């Protein structure tokens, strides 16, 4: 019976995800402050090419032209996130140097916020040729940069995916408001930050507040009474969709629709680590997030309440019969999940921007990570997030940047056709 119910829930989830995907992928990225397009023009011999002209514009009327410096580098400030048209003036390239892919002279680029780096490959002669820049022609530096960016993005997604998977494993609830827990965590930190607390102090306080108020409190006020009334999983899932809408537009009502940044670390100069460029805050956040994920995994595997969580996830009725307080376990899981989500929201806000629909923008990716890794599995959520994060970045090598999320979701579909239970999920037999 339980398997049949979960199968029905899964079917509804896939249908809702399809509709949600159309909405998210069709929406334009929100505008942010301190958004910059950076890149470089490097000759085949490795030397920088100066005085190359590049123009960036959007449909709102923004247009800015920049030129590369003596090292071939350029940085063009943007008004915020969005889709931009990039035009490279090939007449400013030196004689004997051309774009390997002529289509790079005019292309569109989706920028979510922060610092966006583009890499343009140059060759000797007229360029182009019969093979104009497919995946096999990508430079090693470009591949490593995208791989690195994908890992960092995957770590951030894992914070949301792990909490979502813990809640699903213990309650069977497919929580469509989980992405908005990221938003609430980020805006809690933003309130404290704007009240005068440094973000280093505001962030951990916000995580604790979010864990207690939006995790434990939400379960106490909403989900526990619904479980006591034997509300069905599909009905609870629909309630979570309504809750997500209420949270999302509530944040928009009280904070406005414009993006907002924290008072510290909104813009940082990039650093070079070999062929990879990043920012100090991105490295620190990724390191702290990795530590948080490791601690959570150890807690689930080794602690008494963690073992009880696994028992409830396997069979709630049997766990209750052996003396485990199922409701206490669920309350703890909700608290941990909300804390991880709040951390993910602060991570997202520091690296991109804080805006009312920031959680919705990554919700589909979080669901994809959970489904790909395996529903109800701790390691699966993390591995799924890393796989999705890396594929989202790497697929931009072969498809337009604004469609890179589609490529990652296509890979997820292919993997699920081969292994329906996900990478680490367990196969269940019906009947």
Residue ranges and their predicted role:
Residues 143-190, 221-231, 235, 372-378:
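Single transmembrane alpha-helix segments in multi-pass membrane proteins
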Residues 61-73, 77:
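Short, acidic Ser/Thr/Gly-rich low-complexity loop/linker segments typical of extracellular
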Residues 142-146, 300, 333-370, 395, ...:
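Inter-helical junctions in multi-pass inner-membrane proteins, predominant
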Residues 234-302, 329-332, 406, 430-431:
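Transmembrane helix-bundle core of multi-pass membrane transporters
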Residues 38-50:
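Structural motif
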Residues 82, 231, 325-328, 400-431:
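Cytosolic-side transmembrane-helix boundaries in multi-pass membrane proteins
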Residues 198-243, 383-384, 388, 419-420:
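Alpha-helical transmembrane segments within multi-pass membrane transporters and channels
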Residues 277-354, 383:
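Helix-loop-helix "hairpin" substructures at the membrane interface of multi-pass membrane proteins
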